[in-house]
């Protein structure tokens, strides 16, 4: 009979390469969930190549494991293999989320797609997935989204990325609106630049860039 180990114990065995054990004639095995969880352990230590390997193992074990594709998307993005990142995120969107997983994986994938498309300079797709992310996460009296595997990354990073892409496609009013939301969320007294003259656009671009840099440190 096959049984699962306690999560902490199993992750330890995975870490030293013992995926299947035979003790007292009981088979203990690592599931796709376990492999994905260990992939996130590696991701959080910034070992993105190893984490990517474990996420690949997770989706090989269970082709419907949504969080495995989520992890592949994020780890490929960190490795700057952006096409593979996007492909896995999109595949993950079509998979069912495990009802016992408290993490909103769907929103993590939408955020990941926003960042990945922005890194590729595809602003229309950045806006498409950024707006889908906001539709998925913005609720009255609900705390803003924070990435479960990097607390420095949150909904404000998505907002400012969205603002940058709006600016790039010439939708300056939308860019300014998102900048103001970020500033208000930071309790800043600064007003978003709304002047769309040539000089105003230059200042708007500088404001967006400064906020992107500042948010990376918070």
At which residue positions do the language-model features occur?
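Alpha-helical segment of the N-proximal tetratricopeptide repeat
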Residues: 30-57, 61
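Terminal, low-structured helical/coil segments at or just beyond the last alpha-helical repeat
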Residues: 164, 168-218
């Amino acid at each position: 009979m096959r049984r699962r180990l306690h999560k902490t114990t199993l992750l330890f065995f995975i870490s030293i390469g013992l995926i299947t054990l035979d003790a007292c004639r009981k088979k203990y095995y690592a599931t796709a969930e376990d492999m994905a969880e260990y992939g996130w352990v590696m991701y959080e230590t910034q070992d993105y190549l190893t984490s990517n390997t474990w996420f690949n193992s997770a989706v090989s074990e269970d082709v419907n494991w949504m969080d495995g594709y989520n992890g592949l998307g994020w780890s490929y993005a960190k490795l700057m293999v952006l096409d593979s990142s996007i492909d896995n995120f999109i595949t993950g969107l079509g998979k069912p989320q495990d009802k016992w997983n408290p993490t909103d994986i769907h929103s993590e994938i939408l955020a990941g797609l926003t960042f990945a498309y922005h890194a590729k300079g595809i602003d229309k797709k950045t806006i498409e997935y950024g707006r889908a992310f906001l539709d998925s996460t913005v609720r009255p009296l609900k705390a803003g989204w924070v990435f479960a595997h990097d607390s420095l990354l949150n909904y404000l990073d998505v907002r400012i990325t969205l603002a940058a892409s709006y600016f790039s496609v010439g939708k300056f009013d939308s860019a300014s609106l998102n900048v103001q939301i970020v500033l208000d969320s930071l309790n800043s007294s600064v007003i978003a630049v709304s002047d769309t003259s040539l000089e105003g656009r230059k200042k708007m671009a500088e404001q967006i860039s400064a906020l992107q840099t500042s948010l990376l440190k918070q």
